[in-house]
Amino acid sequence: MSELVNKMENLSVGDSAQKKSAYVPPHVKRRMKEGGSEPSSRNTENFGNGGRFGGSEHNGFGGGRGSWFGGNARGGGPRSSDRGGSSRFGKWVDGKHVPMKRNEKLEVQLFGTPEDPNFQSSGINFDNYDDIPVDASGEDVPDPITEFTSPPLDELLLENIKLARFTKPTPVQKYSVPIVAKGRDLMACAQTGSGKTGGFLFPVLSQSFSNGPASTPDESGYYMRKAYPTAVVLAPTRELATQIFDEAKKFTYRSWVKPCVVYGGADIRQQIRELERGCDLIVATPGRLNDLLERGKISLCSVKYLVLDEADRMLDMGFEPQIRHIVEGCDMPTVENRQTLMFSATFPTDIQHLAADFLKDYIFLSVGRVGSTSENITQKVLHVEDIDKRSVLLDLLAASDGGLTLVFVETKRMADALTDFLIMQNLSATAIHGDRTQAERERALAFFRTGRANVLVATAVAARGLDIPNVTHVINYDLPSDIDDYVHRIGRTGRAGNTGLATAFFNRGNKNVVKELVDILEEANQEVPSFLSQIAKEMSYGGGGGKSSRGGRGGYSRGNSTRDFRRHGGGGGSEWSSANRASSGWGNANRTGSGWGGSSGFGGSTESWSNASKTVGSNNSWW
């Protein structure tokens, strides 16, 4: 990583942002010196058309993503009362958990091998996290754990954690495990790459393994007519949902708990077939879950745990009416009769007010410095005019040390155009954005994860939550207008205690985020370029904002994104929630006359809303 940083510093970009009259990429220069020919217009890996991967190959992904157990998941018949009947699952017999026998072939499939780079251990460089400050607020906060032990964790879960090569809990896991074990609700704010997924899976699965399944109605026939999950995990994007599902498969190994995943863009009939075979933990996007609830394929009456991952994004992107319908408009137990856990890297004050409606007597957990960036990530800001961005990008890629590079752009059109340009330069690149089909998006991610494409050009659809091992460099080709999106983007590298590099292309078109960008760099002990300081001063003297806007919800101060509003001001939660939602169209008032009720609230397998409610959650790429 230090070699890559040194190579970057030798590039002719920076404060002066000098333009090049006739740019020749470094790899072309090398070929010309060696007497090589000019690069061909296309490589042979078929990454063309913005990385659409021609042909019909699905590479094991697509509509049947949740079908990892095969066509006969529960032994070919209805689910028995002991929750067993298959060699792939444990059983719950006479109030006891009976794990299945170990399966070495399945273990390699789930956990990989130590030398496999695609299965990254969270133990690497993990001691870097030991000094991270943790602030827990609320009444009677339990003491944190320091190691993975039983108690409080179930013995089978500990074995699976060991198979995953997790050696010690992350800061968020140290607190979330005892908090959930005590039956408390939780709002957890932790820096990206800090183990938030394990932060909710570990305690929820441990309690499930120990307490067993909830009782469900007896149903006869080959399949159950409904699934009765005991845990529901909501995620804003399809990619994040499948990633959580992949982790759930690891940690439910040999147990009675069967995980499933449902999301839009995939074959709903296949997802229904999986649900009919039984589902104990469901990972879902809000739109598809509402669709399945309307179809009567899922009952939430047995839910003990509700988890919202990237909760701030879901509540801020127009998902609140859908989530409120799931939580309050169906048969889910009330807030007093379930545990609710919310996780994200940022929780702005206005989102905390909304989130508080779904929680009871909760503990607020803030892990890491305010600003939520990791010092494991080296941040570089280069002054690059729009006309020079492609040239500078090629320089950075030529200086790469061979790791994976994630390039963020603002528009879908730019993602395709930039990917095609990189392919023309004989670089293995692919793209992911909301206009891709689900099969195309999953295949692009598969190519990137395995290194067949070492450059992924992405819009915001991939910015949140995705954990791709070996991403050594994140490049913000287009800086976002929201500084929190910048935090989440650069968090795709430097994960799990590892080091990473994040480079941002900045020019005066990005001056709306300059003040907060300087704050982020200073808080993470990063170098602030002189041109950035100068523009920040100009903005300050000229009365410029420097505040980022928040899609239709107004600006907010980033200073409270990781602080409990109950301790740091902002008024009473219930008073704010009721008064402001009534005036701003949020919450129950927004549902009235918005297409709720009956069968018209959701549009079948495509998850489109009725015409009256398309203004809510209209960005379908998040479904």
Curated annotation (Swiss-Prot):
This is ATP-dependent RNA helicase DED1. ATP binds at residues 190-197. Pfam families: DEAD, Helicase_C. Gene3D superfamilies: P-loop containing nucleotide triphosphate hydrolases. Residues 1-93, 541-623 are annotated as: Disordered. It is found in: Cytoplasm. The Q motif is unique to and characteristic of the DEAD box family of RNA helicases and controls ATP binding and hydrolysis. Residues 177-365 form the Helicase ATP-binding domain. The lineage of its organism: Eukaryota, Fungi, Dikarya, Ascomycota, Saccharomycotina. One of its GO terms (cellular component) is nucleus. It comes from Eremothecium gossypii (strain ATCC 10895 / CBS 109.51 / FGSC 9923 / NRRL Y-1056). GO terms for biological process: cytoplasmic translational initiation; negative regulation of cytoplasmic translational initiation in response to stress; positive regulation of formation of translation preinitiation complex; regulatory ncRNA-mediated gene silencing; spliceosomal complex disassembly. Keywords: ATP-binding, Cytoplasm, Helicase, Hydrolase, Initiation factor, Nucleotide-binding, Protein biosynthesis, RNA-binding. Its main location: cytoplasm. Residues 575-591, 611-623 have a biased composition (Polar residues). Belongs to the DEAD box helicase family. DDX3/DED1 subfamily. InterPro entries: DEAD/DEAH_box_helicase_dom, Ded1/Dbp1_DEADc, Helicase_ATP-bd, Helicase_C-like, P-loop_NTPase, RNA-helicase_DEAD-box_CS, RNA_helicase_DEAD_Q_motif.
